[in-house]
Structures are given as C-alpha cells and as structure tokens.
C-alpha cells in the first residue's frame, strides 16, 4: 500500500461512522445522569413538591431551574429563608458558586430533595445530617473527599449522587445508609469497595464507573434488587460468581476492565437486556449466556475471543446490533441464518476472517449496516446480491480482487467503502446504485472507471485516490451532487472538460499525478470549489510561475486565458493541501 499524500480527512466521512470505531455506538452507561426521584406520597404538602418525570432514553435534568454558569449573585441565605417560610420540600442551589453551606440549612426540616450540583463544596457540613425527611441528596461536581458521619441519621435517604468529586475511599457512612436505592460514585478516585456495600440491600442502581477499582467484592451478590450496575472503566480483574444472585438486573456494564472470564452464573440474569463487555481480556464466553435471551445489543469489541458459544446468537431473540470487532475470529460465527433475523447492524472489523459463508444473511431482512473492514477476505459470497436491505457496506482493507456483478441489486446502498483492496475494475452494475452518497475506492488497482458512474446522481463523496487511473470518464460530469472528489496519486494525463458541470464540487484533489500536464478551462465553472490540491503535478502546459503561485492563481489564469473570461468570479480555491 502506498502512503496517501496531499489529503485531509473530511468531517463528511467521519459523520457517516464508516471508518470510525463502531463500539461506542453500542456502549452502555447506567442511567445515573441525575438522582432518581423518590416515591410520591399523598399528603397535604404535595402541592409544594416539584417532581421530575424522566422519559426512557432522555437524559433527565437535575433541577427545574438550570443555571448554565455559576452565579455568585444568588443569595443563599435568602433562598434558605424562603424555603423555610414556605415549608418547601425541594431546594436547588446547583451551579451557584457555593463553597460553604450555612448552618441555618438544618432548619429546613421539611426538605426532601437537596440539589447542590456543580458548586465548589469541599466539606459537607454536619447540618445536612439534621434533615430528617431528606430523600434525595445530589452532590455531583464538587470537591468532596469524604462525608460527615452523622449522615447516618438520614433514615429516609434513597438517592445519593456523588459523581465527579475527589473521593479516594468510599466513606464508611455510606455503607450505613441502608435505605438507599440509588448510589452514584462514578468519576472519582476510588480504588477499593469494602464488603460493607453488601449492607445496602435495597440498592437498585449502582454506578462506580471511571474509578480505579480492581476487585468487586463477593457481597455484591447480596444486592438482589439491583437493576443497573455500572462498573465500567475501572481495573476489575474478576466478576464474582455471586453476581448471579442479582436476578432483577437489566443492565450490566463491565466494559473497559481487565476481566479474563465470566462466571457461569451470569446465565441466571435472565432479565438482562444490556450487557457491556467491550475491551476486557475475555478469551471465551460461557454457554449459559444464551439464557440471557433479552439482550438486544451484544458488543464484545476489543477482547481475545475466537469463537462464540454455538447457540448463543440463536438464543438472543431480540438481537438488533452485533459487534465482534477487534477479536481473534478466523471464521464467521457458527449458527443458522435465523440468528440474524432481527439484526440491523453487524460489525466484525479487525479480525482474521477469510470468508463470509454463502446464505448466512438469508434471513437478515433488516440488515442495513455491515462492516467487515480489516479482515482477510479475498471475495464476497455468490449470494452477495441478495443483501438488498443494506444501506452501508464497508469491506475496506481486505484482499478482494473482484466485485460481483450482482452488486446492481443492492439498490438501497448509500455508503460503499471498498478502500485498500485489490480491485482492478468496477462492475458496470454499480450504476444501478442510485441512492449511493459515498463511494470510497482508495488504494486499489483500478485502471478505469465505468461510464455507468454517471447514474450515481445522489453521490456526494467520491474517493479514487491511490489507484492506476490514466483518465476519468467524461460521464463524471453528470455527478452534480458531488462535493468531494479525490483522484490524487494516480496516472492521470488529463482531466475531462465535463468536470465543469460538477456545480456542487467543493474539494478537488489532483495531487501526485506525475503525468498531468494541463487542466481544463472548465474548472472555472466549478463555482463552489473551495479547496484544490495540485501538489506534485507538473502542469507543464501552464506557465511555471502560475503553477508555483498555487491553485488560486491557476484558476485565475484559466479564467483569463480561456473562453470563460467574461464570467463573474463565483469562487476561487484558496488552499493547496
């Protein structure tokens, strides 16, 4: 492969998520964005409560009045006085530049919810422990390192949010807050979770994400009411078998740890719908995982797995997204075609797979995105033309030397990535892909482009960099929607006049065509052109001082010397990349 020169990555391709790592699209995060609202009781004070309704999948707001920047103008004493006089049950002092809480806070005995997000509090005063009715205490984004012991008096506390603080050790008092249902400790500096965590038997949501924890204690199995557990982005070296006792678990996030294996007991978590296993040290998966049939997104990217349990995929009846990237698969996952009947996204890039079996996607009527980039494929299966639901196909960085003519049946394709293969030509049937927006064939061995390319009227990005092209078809002028055209590092001797019809063209890369002696006058008709690269092109038909002046001067010269010198200057490329 040749090193590509004279190009810059465009945000257009990145936004399509073709060359990006797909793992993040399926990453799991426990829903700990804000404190969980407490149960609403019917009492005369209910009219003084402000409740927050959180829709599934929508990031909840911690407070009703959101302050985008810290406000030193807020008079905390007046807020507390007002709260006391009204007998309010909720106080929001979030993002108010608070450093010290006043002692009169203890007088707010009716308070049920206290929000102190985004302040500068380093020490929580013991007065907070004197709020007997407090159910929600939100302290995210402060400078706390510990908590006062008398918080143990908060016998009604259900939600404790300590995200984004400076806690190195979980304060002992937390292990005594036995009424907690929600505990968020993510983004701290915690290295140890003591066995006292087992005391919090009512916990439903626990987040320890982004800490420095190595060992998850076995008593985690005593938290039988857990619904979501997020211990991702730590240094966890084991998952205790007792995790199987948490039978109400629906979301378990273990990604970015050092876990070498999963216990068989994980198969008891039959309510689970989300399981995050990305970037661990897993070399295999237990057969019992097939019992977790409700999982809809299965992502094991970045492990050492070479094969899946035989019946696993067939058992995941709700599976819509499957990511097996960056493992050690040498063969396609075994199993009948029905295992993909609900799958819409299948990503298996960066493995060692040599073949996609015939008929494997016969039942995959919803499959819209297939990424098998960076494997060892030499061809595509004979039934390739039956993958008619595909919208995005990425087979880059393989050893494919020929595309099947049946590609004409993939009429829903919008993105086709074929870069870094061994293709010498494209089938004429490619002209049938009328919805295609991105066609990337960089670093192949193409000697020509079929004239049928003219039918790709929806095409916006065409990448032909680093091939063996001696010319471009005149029909390229029909591609009036193309904004990005890269034909650098080829063997072009000319550019067709019809390029002037590409009215949407914004970026044109002609760099490193060592036989390119001239440019057509029609380039001046590309009124949207902003960037043109002509680096390392001789362009001997033009005056050397003009070429040395760069693309802007070249365009001006073509305009003045050609038949279009009476036209209004609608745009001149300003840079040579």
From Swiss-Prot:
Residues 1-10, 33-48 have a biased composition (Basic and acidic residues). GO terms for molecular function: volume-sensitive anion channel activity. LRR repeats lie at residues 87-109, 110-131, 133-155, 156-177, 179-201, 202-223, 225-246, 248-269, 271-292, 294-315, 318-339, 342-363, 366-387, 389-410, 412-434, 435-456, 458-479, 481-502, 504-526, 528-549. SMART domains: LRR_BAC, LRR_SD22, LRR_TYP. It holds the Pfam family LRR_8. Residues 1-71 are annotated as: Disordered. One of its GO terms (biological process) is intracellular signal transduction. InterPro entries: Leu-rich_rpt (IPR001611), Leu-rich_rpt_typical-subtyp (IPR003591), LRR_dom_sf (IPR032675), LRR_domain-containing (IPR050216), LRR_R13L4/SHOC2-like (IPR055414). Keywords: Leucine-rich repeat, Repeat. The keyword Transferase does not apply. Acts as a Ras effector and participates in MAPK pathway activation. Probably acts as a scaffolding protein in a protein phosphatase complex that specifically dephosphorylates Raf kinase and stimulate Raf activity at specialized signaling complexes upon Ras activation. Belongs to the SHOC2 family. This is Leucine-rich repeat protein soc-2 homolog. It comes from Nematostella vectensis.
């Amino acid at each position: 492969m040749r090193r590509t020169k004279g190009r810059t990555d465009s945000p257009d391709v990145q936004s399509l998520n073709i060359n990006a790592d797909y793992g993040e699209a399926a990453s799991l995060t426990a829903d700990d964005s804000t404190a969980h609202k407490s149960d609403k009781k019917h009492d005369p004070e209910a009219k003084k409560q402000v409740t927050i309704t959180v829709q599934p999948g929508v990031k909840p707001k911690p407070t009703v009045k959101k302050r985008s920047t810290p406000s030193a103008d807020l008079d905390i004493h007046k807020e507390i006085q007002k709260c006391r006089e009204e007998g309010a049950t909720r106080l929001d002092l979030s993002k108010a530049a608070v450093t010290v809480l006043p002692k009169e806070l203890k007088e707010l005995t009716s308070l049920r919810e206290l929000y102190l997000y985004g302040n500068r509090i380093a020490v929580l005063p013991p007065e907070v422990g004197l709020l007997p009715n407090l159910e929600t205490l939100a302290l995210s984004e402060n400078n706390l390192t510990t908590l006062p012991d008398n918080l143990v008096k908060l016998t009604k506390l259900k939600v404790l949010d300590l995200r984004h603080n400076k806690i190195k050790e979980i304060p002992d008092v937390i292990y005594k807050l036995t009424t907690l249902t929600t505990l968020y400790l993510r983004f701290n500096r915690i290295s140890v979770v003591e066995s006292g965590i087992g005391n919090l038997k009512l916990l439903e949501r626990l987040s320890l994400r982004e800490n420095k924890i190595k060992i998850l204690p076995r008593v985690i199995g005593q938290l039988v009411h857990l619904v979501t557990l997020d211990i991702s982005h730590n240094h966890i070296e084991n998952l205790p078998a007792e995790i199987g006792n948490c039978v109400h678990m629906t979301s378990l996030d273990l990604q970015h740890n050092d876990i070498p294996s999963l216990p068989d007991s994980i198969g008891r978590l039959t309510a689970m719908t989300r399981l995050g296993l990305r970037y661990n040290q897993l070399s295999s998966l237990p057969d019992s995982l097939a019992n977790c049939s409700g999982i809809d997104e299965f992502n094991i990217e970045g492990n050492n797995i070479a094969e899946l349990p035989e019946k696993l995929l067939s058992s995941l009846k709700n599976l819509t997204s499957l990511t097996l990237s960056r493992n050690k698969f040498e063969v396609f996952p075994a199993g009948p075609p029905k295992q993909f009947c609900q799958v819409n996204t299948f990503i298996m890039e960066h493995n060692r797979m040599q073949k996609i079996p015939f008929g494997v996607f016969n039942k995959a009527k919803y499959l819209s995105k297939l990424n098998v980039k960076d494997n060892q494929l030499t061809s595509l299966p004979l039934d390739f033309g039956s993958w008619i639901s595909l919208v995005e196909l990425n087979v880059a960085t393989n050893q494919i030397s020929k595309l099947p003519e049946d590609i004409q049946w993939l009429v829903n394709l919008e993105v086709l990535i074929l870069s870094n293969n061994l293709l010498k030509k494209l089938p004429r049937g490619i002209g049938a892909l009328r919805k295609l927006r991105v066609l990337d064939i960089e670093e192949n061995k193409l000697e020509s482009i079929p004239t049928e390319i003219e039918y790709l009227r929806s095409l916006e990005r065409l990448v032909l960099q680093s091939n063996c092209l001696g010319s471009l078809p005149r029909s390229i002028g029909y591609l009036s929607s193309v904004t990005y055209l890269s034909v650098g590092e080829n063997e072009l001797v000319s550019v067709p006049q019809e390029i002037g019809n590409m009215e949407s063209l914004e970026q044109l890369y002609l760099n490193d065509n060592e036989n390119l002696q001239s440019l057509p006058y029609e380039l001046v008709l590309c009124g949207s052109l902003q960037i043109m690269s002509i680096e390392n092109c001789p362009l001997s038909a033009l005056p050397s001082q003009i070429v040395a002046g760069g693309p802007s001067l070249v365009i001006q010269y073509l305009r003045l010397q050609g038949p279009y010198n009476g036209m209004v200057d609608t745009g001149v490329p300003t840079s040579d990349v």
